[in-house]
UniProtKB/Swiss-Prot annotation:
Keyword tags: DNA damage, DNA recombination, DNA repair, Metal-binding, Zinc, Zinc-finger
Homology family: Belongs to the RecR family.
Annotated ranges, domain Toprim: 87-182
Function: May play a role in DNA repair. It seems to be involved in an RecBC-independent recombinational process of DNA repair. It may act with RecF and RecO.
One BP annotation, GO: DNA repair
Species the sequence originates in: Roseiflexus sp. (strain RS-1)
Superkingdom of the organism of origin: Bacteria
Identification of the protein by name: Recombination protein RecR
InterPro entries: DNA_Rcmb_RecR, Rcmb_RecR, Rcmb_RecR_Znf, TOPRIM_dom, TOPRIM_RecR
Lineage: Bacteria, Bacillati, Chloroflexota, Chloroflexia, Chloroflexales
Pfam families for the chain: RecR_C (PF21175), RecR_HhH (PF21176), RecR_ZnF (PF02132), Toprim_4 (PF13662)
Gene: recR
GO molecular function: DNA binding; zinc ion binding
ZnF (C4-type) residues: 64-79
PROSITE patterns: RECR (PS01300), TOPRIM (PS50880)
Length: 205
């Protein structure tokens, strides 16, 4: 639909939902319109359940105080699990990267989620992500190895370089995922087999 003309004939609540959905990543005006009209036709319980789920998401989910993954309590399920290997920390950019690595079934250590990457052109620097918090953990916890699993793109490699340089004086083994992941891609889209092989074949930095 033509946003400048056709949308003006719609009721205000419909326009508002289209505009809000259009703010989501990967959702353009046409998809936002289709979703809005689908919800308009749907039984009342579906939009209401969706609204409740969105409210619960923002009110009940927070960041783990240790690794910055997502949780409903103070510690996430991974940090709270005594069976996880406390000696190894895998550093990732985003929470979805944790989900991708867990899907491989080959990793049993802990995580540290940066919530971003070092990208000066985007205004993202070391102090804008959970970079120094990782260094504090390595100093305070019985960590022997840090696996750097940032994305295989320019920003991810730059972040890995800065991490390696900061970790070097702390006396821990620093490794990087093996080559084989699609260059320029995101970890979350890697298939479990390829990602698992990259973990098992990780190399010293």
């Amino acid at each position: 639909m033509h946003q400048t003309h056709d949308i003006q004939i719609l009721p205000a609540p419909v326009i508002r939902l289209i505009e809000e959905l259009n703010r989501l990543p990967g959702v353009g005006p046409k998809t936002a319109s289709r979703l809005t009209f689908f919800l308009l036709r749907a039984p009342d319980d579906l939009p209401l359940a969706l609204a409740h789920a969105l409210t619960a998401l923002k009110q009940q989910v927070q960041l783990c105080s240790r690794c910055y993954f997502i949780t409903q309590g103070d510690l996430c399920a991974i940090c709270a699990n005594p069976a996880r290997d406390q000696r190894v920390i895998c550093v990732v950019e985003e929470p979805l990267d944790v989900v991708a690595i867990e899907r491989t079934g080959v990793y049993r250590g802990l995580y540290h989620v940066l919530h971003g990457r070092i990208a000066p052109l985007e205004g993202m620097n070391r102090e804008d992500i959970y970079f120094d918090e990782l260094l504090d953990r390595v100093r305070a916890e019985p960590v022997e190895e840090v696996i750097i699993a940032t994305n295989p793109n320019l920003e991810g490699e730059a972040t890995a370089f800065h991490l390696q340089r900061a970790l070097a004086p702390l006396g821990v083994r620093v490794t990087r995922l093996a080559r084989g992941l699609p260059t320029g891609g995101d970890l979350e889209w890697a298939d479990p087999g390829t990602l698992g092989s990259a973990l098992e074949g990780r190399r010293e930095m």
